[in-house]
Structure formats: structure tokens, C-alpha cells
């Protein structure tokens, strides 16, 4: 699933469907860093979760991202492929087609430092959302994205909806 704008999918339903049809769950949690479903963090429900640190995300390193998994074999494979698939760290021997998806150390350090500040970033996102709700509730037919009672959303981007379109 893709968790959109800080909100999370109904993971119980999705996991039930995955079991029924023998599917693997891989979460795109790019917009849901810091969001929870029934007390469990986004990205932790399937075989793997992915997060982006692009410039417009709640935490940014200017680019790059993170893969999370509890599967040790998959974690090693991901690390191997994202570090150019070198079979020897000192020689230029590649046993598969790999890519250079490593964050440079400075960018990684920025991400780690911001991770410690994530609760404060999310608190501020909630304050902004509360402001918009206070100021825009009752204006025309504006309504806000609904968040399931089971979700603690990070409010990544305030989202409003309306039936009317201005041409």
C-alpha cells in the first residue's frame, strides 16, 4: 500500500487480503513517517517498508531514503544491491547489476539528527492542521481528509476537499 499524506491504510484489512491471495505486503511509507496504525509504526506491517527523505518530506536529507525490514536475508540483499553489488569491497567485481543508492555521510548524519526531532516536527504539523481546521471549517463546502480512529497520522500535508471547482 501507499500511505498518503500522512494517513495510513487499514492494515488489518490489507493484511487479510494479502493472506487470502498469498501476496507480499510492501509498504510505501514515504509520506507517513511517524504515523501509527493501532500503535504500530508505518513501514512495519509487511515484508518491508520504504521511506523517502526528499526535500519536501517531514525529514529531509535532500534525497535518498530508507528501507526497513525484519528479514535479514532481504536486508543483506538490499544493502548489496544499493552499494553497487560489489562482491569484494576493494576490487571492482560486481556479481549483479547494482546501484549507488548510498547516502553520503553528511546527509545520513543530517537524517539521524532530524530523526531525534521527529516528534516536534509532527507536533508542529498537527498545530498547522488544527489552525486550518479552525479557520476553514464552515467555509463553503470545504472538508478535511478523514483519518481513521485507528490511525495517529503525522499530518504531513494538510488536505482539504471541495466539490466545487473554480474555472
Q: For each predicted feature, which ranges?
A:
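PLP-dependent aminotransferase class I/II
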Residues: 1-2, 7-13, 20, 36, ...
Amino acid at each position: 500500500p501507499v500511505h498518503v499524506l500522512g494517513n495510513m491504510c487499514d492494515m488489518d484489512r490489507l493484511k487479510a487480503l494479502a493472506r487470502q491471495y498469498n501476496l507480499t505486503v510492501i509498504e510505501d511509507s514515504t509520506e507517513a513517517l511517524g504515523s501509527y496504525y493501532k500503535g504500530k509504526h508505518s513501514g512495519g506491517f509487511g515484508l518491508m517498508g520504504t521511506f523517502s527523505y526528499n526535500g519536501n518530506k517531514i525529514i529531509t536529507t535532500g534525497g535518498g531514503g530508507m528501507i526497513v525490514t525484519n528479514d535479514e536475508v532481504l536486508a543483506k540483499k538490499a544493502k548489496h544491491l544499493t552499494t553497487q553489488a560489489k562482491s569484494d569491497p576493494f576490487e571492482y567485481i560486481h556479481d549483479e547489476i547494482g546501484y549507488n543508492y548510498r547516502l553520503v555521510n553528511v546527509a545520513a548524519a543530517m537524517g539521524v539528527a532530524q530523526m531525534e526531532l521527529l516528534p516536534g516536527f509532527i507536533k508542529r504539523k498537527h498545530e498547522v492542521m488544527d489552525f486550518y481546521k479552525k479557520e476553514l471549517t464552515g467555509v463553503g463546502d470545504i472538508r478535511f481528509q478523514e483519518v481513521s480512529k485507528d490511525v495517529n497520522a503525522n499530518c504531513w500535508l494538510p488536505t482539504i476537499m471541495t466539490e466545487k471547482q473554480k474555472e
